[in-house]
C-alpha cells in the first residue's frame, strides 16, 4: 500500500526537479547582488538603531531599573547580616 502511494509522489517530485527553476526563481546577476549590499546594510543599520532606541526608551520609562537596584541592595544587606 505504501509503495503504491509513494510512486506517484516520487514521479511528481522527479518531474519538478527535472523541470528546473522558474524564470522568477532564477539566480540574480552577481553584479546586481553586489550593488544592493550597501543599501541592505544601511537599511539593517537603521532598523537596528530604531529597535535599540525603542528598547532603551522602554527601559527608561519602566520602573525596572529602580526595582533591580532595590532588589540588589536588599540582597546585599541580607548577605551582610549573614556574614
Curated annotation (Swiss-Prot):
An example Gene Ontology molecular-function term: fatty acid binding
Cellular location(s): Secreted
GO BP terms: lipid transport; lipoprotein metabolic process; negative regulation of cholesterol transport; negative regulation of lipid catabolic process; negative regulation of very-low-density lipoprotein particle clearance; triglyceride metabolic process; very-low-density lipoprotein particle clearance
Record flagged with keyword Signal: yes
Keywords: Lipid transport, Secreted, Signal, Transport, VLDL
Secretion signal, residue range per the UniProt entry: 1-26
Tagged with keyword Secreted: yes
Gene3D superfamilies (alphabetical): Apolipoprotein C-I
Pfam families, sorted: ApoC-I
Main location: secreted
GO cellular component terms, semicolon-separated: high-density lipoprotein particle; very-low-density lipoprotein particle
Family: Belongs to the apolipoprotein C1 family.
Biological function: Inhibitor of lipoprotein binding to the low density lipoprotein (LDL) receptor, LDL receptor-related protein, and very low density lipoprotein (VLDL) receptor. Associates with high density lipoproteins (HDL) and the triacylglycerol-rich lipoproteins in the plasma and makes up about 10% of the protein of the VLDL and 2% of that of HDL. Appears to interfere directly with fatty acid uptake and is also the major plasma inhibitor of cholesteryl ester transfer protein (CETP). Binds free fatty acids and reduces their intracellular esterification.
Protein name: Apolipoprotein C-I
Native organism taxonomy: Eukaryota, Metazoa, Chordata, Craniata, Vertebrata
Gene: APOC1
